[in-house]
Amino acid sequence: MAGAEDGPGQQPELEDDEAASCRRWGAQHAGARELAALYSPGKRFQEWCCVVLCFSLIAHNMAHLLLLARWEHTPLVMLGMVAGALLADFLSGLVHWGADTWGSVELPIVGKAFIRPFREHHIDPTAITRHDFIETNGDNCLLTLLPLLNMAYKFRTQSPEVLEQLYPWECFVFCLIIFGTFTNQIHKWSHTYFGLPCWVVFLQDWHVILPRKHHRIHHVSPHETYFCITTGWLNYPLERMGFWRRLEDIIQALTGEKPRADDMKWAQKIK
């Protein structure tokens, strides 16, 4: 597998006997091993179903969009592509922030299925580079199924005249879906430092997708900033605004829950 960085930028001191028995970060960390073991056959089956259905719908909808394309749509389509990428980046940050900061692996259904990978990722950041295409993209494919199905339904039921009027909007939605579907693949590439295709490196270097150096900022413990992982365009402005910190302060004031408490619990496991 292609190489990746070994772990977060800051690591706490360990006692000699503790350091000898386990690594603070990485695949040998006790919490990382326990979390990885929670990946079940049922979860794998769900991911396979979502990936197959998602990419079938993407192919179906793309074919219809290409058939409906007109030169006069170009300006609005280009605007929609940029807007779709921006919204996908924000939504990736919102989901990433929510899963990193709140909830627990012990929660019914969503804990092991969706929060678990976020906990594993912080104590073993390179685990994602060892995941295959299905495990990497299965959950994102699940999230984009509903808008893909809605788009496919429109193509099957609406008249050509109505579809032509809706075309710029549908291109925006499709771009949002594509960026959303591939967010975790882009995230995986941001942790991969050797063997990436030249076109991926080009897109990273020109900041079309999340660059590798840019994403390192998030992986400095306690993982409280730079949550947007699709393009990363919104990380700096949101950080300057204190957006995530303000949201955390509001939620903590209302609920009494401490941000990233479960994340730190898993990070501190030593056996």
Curated annotation (Swiss-Prot):
Entry's EC annotation: 1.14.19.77
Ranges annotated as spanning the membrane: 48-68, 75-95, 162-182
Keywords annotated in UniProt: Endoplasmic reticulum, Fatty acid metabolism, Lipid metabolism, Membrane, Oxidoreductase, Transmembrane, Transmembrane helix
Any single Gene Ontology cellular-component annotation: endoplasmic reticulum membrane
UniProt main location, coarse: endoplasmic reticulum
Similarity-based family: Belongs to the fatty acid desaturase CarF family.
Function: Plasmanylethanolamine desaturase involved in plasmalogen biogenesis in the endoplasmic reticulum membrane. Plasmalogens are glycerophospholipids with a hydrocarbon chain linked by a vinyl ether bond at the glycerol sn-1 position, and are involved in antioxidative and signaling mechanisms.
Domain remark text: Histidine box-1 and -2 together with other histidine residues are essential for catalytic activity.
Protein name: Plasmanylethanolamine desaturase 1
